[in-house]
Design a protein with these regions (language model features):
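Catalytic cores of DNA base-excision repair glycosylases
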Residues: 1-128
């Protein structure tokens, strides 16, 4: 674990996640992945240090569940093109994607990657 400012907090959060993996699924990721998405999401959100985005990152990228990840890039792009208000909440923005895109993990993964790529290249924090 490389320090990125708050290494003690990061270590505590990683320990909490490891404890969850051990207690919840006996360290069996496949067993964890077989749980229903929303049930697993609720359990992940109970873990110290895991919020909406991190829970959804784990569900989509690590476990292959069809759930859309909302991050700063997603918020920025959707606001700039006039789809949402600047301060839109996570569930509302996530529902926009979940309700209008095919419910497919690979599709969500690729769609989000394209948002990130576009935001890094053309939709920067401070427009030029």
């Amino acid at each position: 674990v490389y320090p990125s400012g708050y290494y003690n907090a990061k270590a505590r959060k990683l320990k909490a996640l490891c404890k969850f993996l051990h207690d919840f699924c006996e360290d069996d990721i496949d067993r964890m992945a077989s749980r229903p998405t929303q049930e697993l999401r609720i359990e992940l959100l109970r873990v110290y240090g895991i919020g909406n985005e991190t829970a959804d990152d784990i569900l989509l990228y690590a476990l292959g569940h069809p759930i859309f990840v909302v991050d700063t890039y997603t918020r920025r792009l959707m606001h700039r093109i006039g789809v949402v208000e600047e301060r839109v909440n996570y569930p509302k923005l996530q529902a926009l994607f979940m309700d209008n895109l095919p419910s497919d993990a690979q599709y969500f993964n690729e769609f989000h990657a394209l948002i990130v790529r576009h935001s890094v290249v053309a939709c920067k924090k401070s427009p030029e």
